[in-house]
Amino acid sequence: YPQSINFIGNLKTHWSAHGCRFVHGFPPDSVLTYLFQLSDETKIQSLEQLSEKRCFIGHTHTLDIVSFGRQGLKSGKLKEGLNKLDSRRKYIISAGSVGQPRDGNNKAKYLIWDSTEDTVDVRFVAYDIAAVVEKMMAAGLPQKHAQRLW
């Protein structure tokens, strides 16, 4: 557990690869900012300033997608399954979460980005929440965090 905290504490605030940016909160490098807290104007400014065409974020525990192009800003929810991206638009994609669901569905949610096909495949997977809660409590983590997994 302390080794994990040290590892996480030494990570960079963002990472770029394959024409894509990865950041926990909001681009360019915030780990604390929530996507849903920001105005459309702020989202547009961020997308315009990004050198990458795709940006994956976390922090919200939701499957959100925001894109910007000639037709303006579009916002919505990613659905389970294959989602095709428009090569002419820039995107901020919230990748869901394993734990602490915000949508009433406590399955782990993750996605696979295919940079060649420019698709995002959203997947939901059941997992043993009770076992995870038990391990969290045994590790001395706060009970409120363990209970949020349900």
Model-derived segments and their meaning:
Residues 1-56, 60-75:
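Conserved catalytic scaffold of divalent metal-dependent phosphoesterases
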Residues 70-150:
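Acidic, His/Gly-rich catalytic cores of divalent-metal-dependent hydrolytic chemistry
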